[in-house]
A protein has these predicted regions:
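Extracytoplasmic metal-acquisition and chelation regions
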Residues: 17-293
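Sec-dependent bacterial lipoprotein signal peptides
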Residues: 1-15
Length: 293
C-alpha cells in the first residue's frame, strides 16, 4: 500500500512538472508550413513553432481547433502571410493584435487568382483575352489578391526581413537572431541568383500549371504562368482545348499537376506542392522541373 501511494505521488508530481514545462515553453505560431522554415531559420531552437494548417490540408477549407485558438492567444508571436482568407477571419479574434505579424507587408502584390497569360511571342492558350499573371494589376478584382508570395525568392527576402524586424523588436538583445537572419538572407539571395540563371539558360517563355500558385515566381523572372484553373473553378472545355492546342504547338514537355492534359499533349505530368515546408528546397525543385529539357 505504501509503495503504491509513493508511486502515485511521484507520477502525479512528474505530471505536474511536465504540465508546468509545457506552460513555460515559448511558442510561436505560423499560418502555413513554409513560414515555419522561414521563421525557424531565424530563431533556431529557442521556440516551439506550431503550424495552423497541417501537412496535406488546404488553407481554403481550414478550420482551427479549439486547442489551436487557445494556443494562438498564448503564443509569443503569430506569423502569417496576411493574404489568405482564413488568416484574416481567425487572427482578427486574437486578443493581443500587436503580436500578429503580416509577412507580406511591403511586397508588390498581384491582384486576382489569374487563370491565364500571354507568352511574349504569342498569346499562349488564352484565346486572345488573357490576363497576365506575372504583372501587377492596378485595378481591383472581385477575387482579391493572389496570396502565393512565398513561392517567390524575392518576396521571401522581404518576408524574412519582416519576420526578423518583429523578432528583433520583441527580443532586442539577441545577437544570435541577427546572425541567423543574415545567413538566411544570403541563402535567399543565392536562391534568387541560381533560379534566374537556370531560367535564362533554359530560354523558356512560359510554363503550364493547373492552379496558379507561381504568379510571383513568374513575375520575378520575366516568364509567364499559364494556369488552367480559373479563379478556383474547373476549366471549361473551350479553355482546355486552347491550352492543349497551344502546348502542342510550342512543344511543352511537362505540365505541373494535371495528368489528363499532360496525357493529351504527350507531356510529362509533374506534381508540385507550393505548401512544402522547406521553401528554398521547394523553389529549387520547381525550377528544375520547369527548366528541365
Amino acid at each position: 500500500m505504501y509503495k503504491k501511494f509513493v508511486f502515485i505521488f511521484i507520477a502525479a508530481l512528474m505530471g505536474a512538472c511536465t504540465s508546468r514545462q509545457q506552460a513555460d515553453e515559448k511558442t510561436l505560431y505560423v499560418s502555413i508550413l513554409p513560414l515555419r522554415s522561414l521563421v525557424g531559420e531565424i530563431v533556431g531552437d529557442d521556440f516551439k513553432i506550431e503550424v495552423l494548417v497541417p501537412p496535406g490540408a488546404s488553407p481554403e477549407t481550414f478550420e482551427p481547433t479549439p486547442r489551436q485558438f487557445i494556443g494562438l492567444n498564448r503564443a509569443e508571436m503569430i506569423f502569417n502571410v496576411g493574404l489568405i482568407d482564413f488568416e484574416t477571419t481567425l487572427l482578427s479574434k486574437i486578443e493581443e493584435r500587436g503580436k500578429v505579424v503580416n509577412l507580406s507587408q511591403g511586397i508588390e502584390l498581384i491582384a486576382g487568382s489569374c487563370s491565364h497569360a500571354h507568352t511574349p511571342a504569342k498569346q499562349a492558350a488564352s484565346g486572345g483575352d488573357g490576363t497576365s499573371c506575372a504583372e501587377p494589376h492596378n485595378h481591383s478584382h472581385a477575387h482579391g489578391v493572389d496570396p502565393h508570395v512565398w513561392t517567390s525568392p524575392r518576396a521571401l527576402q522581404k518576408m524574412a526581413q519582416n519576420a526578423y524586424a518583429a523578432i528583433r523588436r520583441a527580443y532586442p538583445d539577441s545577437a544570435k537572431y541577427e546572425t541567423n537572419y543574415k545567413r538566411l538572407q544570403a541563402d535567399l539571395r543565392a536562391l534568387d541568383a541560381r533560379t534566374g540563371e537556370k531560367i535564362a539558360q533554359s530560354g523558356i517563355e512560359y510554363f503550364i500549371i493547373y492552379h496558379p500558385a507561381l504568379t510571383y515566381y513568374a513575375r520575378d523572372y520575366g516568364i509567364r504562368q499559364v494556369a488552367i484553373e480559373a479563379d478556383g473553378k474547373e476549366p471549361s472545355a473551350k479553355r482546355l482545348t486552347q491550352v492543349i492546342r497551344q502546348a502542342r504547338e510550342d512543344g511543352v514537355r511537362r505540365i505541373l499537376y494535371q495528368e489528363i492534359i499532360a496525357r493529351d499533349i504527350d507531356a510529362e505530368y509533374v506534381e508540385v506542392d507550393p505548401l512544402r515546408e522547406d521553401a528554398i528546397a521547394n523553389i529549387d525543385a520547381i525550377t528544375d522541373i520547369i527548366t528541365r529539357r
